[in-house]
Amino acid sequence: MGAYKYLEELQRKKQSDVMRFLYRVRCWEYRQKNVIHRASRPSRPDKARRLGYKAKQGFVIYRIRVRRGGRKRPVPKGATYGKPTNQGVNQLKYQKSLRSTAEERVGRRASNLRVLNSYWVNQDSTYKYFEVILVDPSHKAIRRDARYNWIVNPVHKHREARGLTSAGKKSRGINKGHLFNKTKAGRRHTWKKHNTLSLWRYRS
């Protein structure tokens, strides 16, 4: 068993005394720092490497905290101005994950970099903490690497804002495998298409 296998097993036993202590100490440390700050190295190297991180020039890790809880509808004092108030203001559930939100915020901060992926690192009662892997598209080490230079293409600018990262695809219902064709173009769209009786004038 290699070193990364051991690290993976440690992560699985989050309730062990050692890991609980480590999480508490790290959580305190992260709370003292800015909301978005650069990390010198990933706190979960095994996870970061599985998601594409390499300890070489051109790769950057940013750590971010996102407030937990639902998303309030952005209407001042609950004034919906013609929209039905009984559709709700407070107890709405945001359709995107907090990890996806974290990627978007880091992507806006470091707009010269490309978001590759992200992963959970910690949480407390108020916040969830994530680390986001970013790639510098103008760095020679990235541009010359055949495995990563696809991200240099301008079509991948702000991929996190368009739901093209792993976390973003999840909320869009995009995946591979059995029955995922049922979510193509959106779950509700597919349901509506299947449940709408269409009677064409000229039927074959």
From Swiss-Prot:
GO molecular function, one term: structural constituent of ribosome
Summary of subunit composition and partner proteins: Component of the large ribosomal subunit. Mature ribosomes consist of a small (40S) and a large (60S) subunit. The 40S subunit contains about 32 different proteins and 1 molecule of RNA (18S). The 60S subunit contains 45 different proteins and 3 molecules of RNA (25S, 5.8S and 5S).
Cellular compartments annotated: Cytoplasm
Protein name: Large ribosomal subunit protein eL15
Primary location group: cytoplasm
Single GO BP term: cytoplasmic translation
Gene name linked to the record: RPL15A
Source organism phylogeny: Eukaryota, Fungi, Dikarya, Ascomycota, Saccharomycotina
Gene3D superfamilies reported for this sequence: Ribosomal protein l15e
A Pfam family this chain is assigned to: Ribosomal_L15e
Gene Ontology cellular component list: cytosolic large ribosomal subunit
SUPFAM superfamilies per UniProt: Ribosomal proteins S24e, L23 and L15e (SSF54189)
Record-linked InterPro entries: Rbsml_eL15_core_dom_sf, Ribosomal_eL15, Ribosomal_eL15_CS, Ribosomal_uL23/eL15/eS24_sf
